[in-house]
């Protein structure tokens, strides 16, 4: 099987959608020899920030000499970035080889009359096979949807179950209220693991803490209010947190304080369990952390950022970030959203900040809110709105507007592409190609 054939096979599987539950992936992994049983995991759930917590944690662990696997979704730049070891994506030939192994296992399941796995379950199995093959010391595992019935929750007790900020998202899928969503995500807590959580709303905190207590797990809450900030700009954050003094993270944004505190509590938790991660390794790991699509600067002239905020909580944090860093800048937005997200709330929070907005349709034609319909919604909050035919023309028009008034004006103008992670990889390719 070639890489292209592997992608075609998995793309065909994706047409059948996703189903929550562990029975099918349990059967698939049984056919593959249960590779997950030979791995140690840090399992991360949450609504906003889990990718950043994963990026900080895994980069620090790699810097400390631990061979560290990463499993993430959704991806921004490349399909292959979902499976990484020490920051390097799985090679195409190895991905193809492992996909063929999974395909053969699925064929055996179907021949026995068992239900066929979903594409996410197949991808999760491929990741576990790869991490076992490469003898990873630790795997930092991001849950896909929710917690208790997500395919990633097929693992046994992780070394640490970590929670980024939990808020309302995927209503009706993993819960009909914030409390139900929190209870679902708390399902990754298993007897024998340590639990670390970002600062949560009180009702969410109580659910996580109670679940940890019921399962005999120590519970630690990150204390971002104890973080001392020395510098906070769009170039990153310099801070001290507990014993970690004068650290620098190149990831900027209001949300990163909570994510940093959470990741550092995960590292402290690992040190308590016998892992050895020094302050110098933490410092170096943080400074090397990169995470595309999370308030990422693509260009300095004009300033061009991308951010994947796609729900109310993330939009509120992005608003604070934009107001803090760019209060006296002209703001030009590019925006694309999924029709099944809280786009009315997102636009009402973010769009009043902008002087002009270019709306786009997202690559996923089934889920996108068309650019024309999004423009109608956006016009309630911003007078200058244009629905674009393509993402490329949106980027071109935004850059032209930023540069029309001369270089001095352009230096006080910022462009922000936001609303969904799904199109930011294309935005990045367009912007970086224009810089060359």
Describe these PLM feature segments.
Residues 133, 138-141, 149-162, 166-170, ...:
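Nucleotide phosphate-binding/pyrophosphate-handling subdomain across enzymes
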Residues 201-220, 303-306, 312, 347-413:
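C-terminal helical cap/extension that packs against the catalytic core
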Residues 72, 198-199, 211-232, 250-254, ...:
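Beta-strand->loop->alpha-helix junctions that form or flank phosphate-binding loops
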Residues 57-62, 131, 350, 378:
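Hydrophobic alpha-helical packing residues
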Residues 109-112, 134-142, 158-246, 260, ...:
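Acidic, Mg2+-coordinating active-site environments of NTP-dependent enzymes
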Residues 1-46, 52-66, 70-71, 107-115:
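Short functional linear segments
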Residues 420-436:
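Glycine/aspartate-rich loop-and-adjacent alpha/beta segment that forms the canonical ThDP
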Residues 29, 34-37, 63-156:
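ATP-dependent carboxylate-amine ligase catalytic core
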């Amino acid at each position: 099987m070639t890489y292209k054939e592997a992608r075609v096979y998995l793309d065909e599987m994706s047409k059948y959608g996703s189903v929550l539950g562990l029975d099918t992936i349990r059967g698939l992994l049984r056919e593959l020899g249960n590779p997950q049983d030979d791995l140690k995991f840090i399992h991360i759930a949450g609504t906003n920030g889990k990718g950043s917590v994963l990026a900080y944690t895994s980069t620090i662990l790699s810097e400390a000499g631990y061979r560290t696997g990463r499993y993430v979704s959704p991806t921004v730049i490349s399909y292959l970035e979902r499976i990484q070891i020490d920051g390097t994506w799985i090679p195409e030939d190895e991905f193809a080889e492992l996909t063929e192994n999974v395909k053969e296992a699925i064929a055996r399941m179907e021949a026995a009359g068992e239900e066929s796995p979903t594409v996410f379950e197949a991808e999760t199995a491929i990741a576990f096979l790869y991490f076992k093959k490469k003898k990873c010391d630790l795997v930092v595992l991001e849950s896909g949807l929710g917690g208790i019935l997500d395919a990633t929750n097929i693992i046994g007790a992780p070394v640490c179950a970590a929670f980024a900020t939990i808020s309302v998202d995927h209503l009706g899928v993993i819960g009909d209220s914030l409390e139900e969503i929190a209870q679902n995500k708390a399902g990754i807590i298993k007897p024998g693991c340590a639990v670390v959580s970002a600062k949560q709303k009180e009702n969410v905190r109580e659910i996580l803490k109670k679940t940890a207590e019921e399962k005999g797990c120590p519970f630690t809450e990150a204390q971002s209010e104890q973080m001392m900030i020395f510098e906070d700009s769009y170039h990153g954050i310099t801070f001290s947190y507990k014993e970690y003094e004068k650290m620098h993270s190149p990831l900027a944004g209001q949300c990163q304080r909570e994510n940093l505190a959470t990741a550092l509590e995960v590292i402290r938790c690992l040190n308590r369990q016998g892992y050895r991660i020094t302050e110098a390794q933490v410092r170096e790991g943080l400074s090397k952390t990169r995470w595309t699509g999370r308030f990422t600067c693509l260009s300095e002239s004009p300033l061009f950022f991308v951010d994947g905020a796609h729900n109310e909580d993330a939009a509120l944090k992005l608003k604070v970030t934009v107001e803090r860093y760019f209060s006296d800048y002209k703001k030009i937005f590019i925006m694309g959203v999924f029709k099944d997200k809280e786009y009315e709330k997102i636009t009402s929070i973010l769009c009043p900040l902008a002087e002009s907005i270019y709306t786009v349709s997202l690559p996923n034609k089934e889920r996108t809110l068309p650019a024309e319909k999004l423009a109608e919604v956006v016009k309630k909050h911003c007078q200058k709105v244009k629905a674009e035919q393509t993402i490329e023309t949106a980027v071109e028009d935004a850059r032209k507007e930023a540069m029309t008034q001369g270089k001095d004006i352009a230096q006080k103008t910022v462009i922000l592409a936001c609303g969904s992670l799904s199109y930011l990889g294309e935005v990045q390719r367009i912007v970086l190609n224009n810089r060359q």
